[in-house]
């Protein structure tokens, strides 16, 4: 029962990681052309595309945040999978000792 739950959790975490990594490849943060009241705007690099001007710095930050979450989800999937594999082995070892 526990192994089945760990496998299910591992699969959900793996699919979550895959979805987050895919999303990180297609995310595009639009550039805000509005000039602030003080007239100063931080440095920006723009990329023009079919969706308009993209703010490269903000897009990289957003993709980085998604990659961070995806890596955590992948780590959870690996931990669940490893535990699901190790648990029956540890149970057999324990029963052999008792």
UniProtKB/Swiss-Prot annotation:
<keyword id="KW-1133">Transmembrane helix</keyword>
<feature type="transmembrane region" description="Helical">
    <location>
        <begin position="2"/>
        <end position="22"/>
    </location>
</feature>
<keyword id="KW-0614">Plasmid</keyword>
<dbReference type="GO" id="GO:0005886">
    <property type="term" value="C:plasma membrane"/>
</dbReference>
<feature type="transmembrane region" description="Helical">
    <location>
        <begin position="70"/>
        <end position="90"/>
    </location>
</feature>
<keyword id="KW-0812">Transmembrane</keyword>
<keyword id="KW-0472">Membrane</keyword>
<keyword id="KW-1003">Cell membrane</keyword>
<protein>
    <recommendedName>
        <fullName>Uncharacterized protein y4cB</fullName>
    </recommendedName>
</protein>
């Amino acid at each position: 029962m526990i192994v089945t739950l760990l496998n299910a959790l591992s699969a959900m975490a793996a699919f979550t990681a895959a979805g987050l990594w895919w999303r990180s490849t297609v995310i595009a943060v639009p550039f805000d052309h509005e000039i602030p009241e003080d007239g100063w705007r931080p440095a920006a690099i723009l990329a023009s595309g079919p969706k308009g001007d993209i703010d490269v710095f903000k897009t990289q930050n957003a993709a980085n945040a998604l990659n961070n979450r995806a890596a955590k989800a992948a780590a959870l999937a690996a931990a669940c999978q490893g535990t699901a594999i190790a648990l029956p082995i540890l149970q057999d070892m324990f029963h052999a000792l008792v």
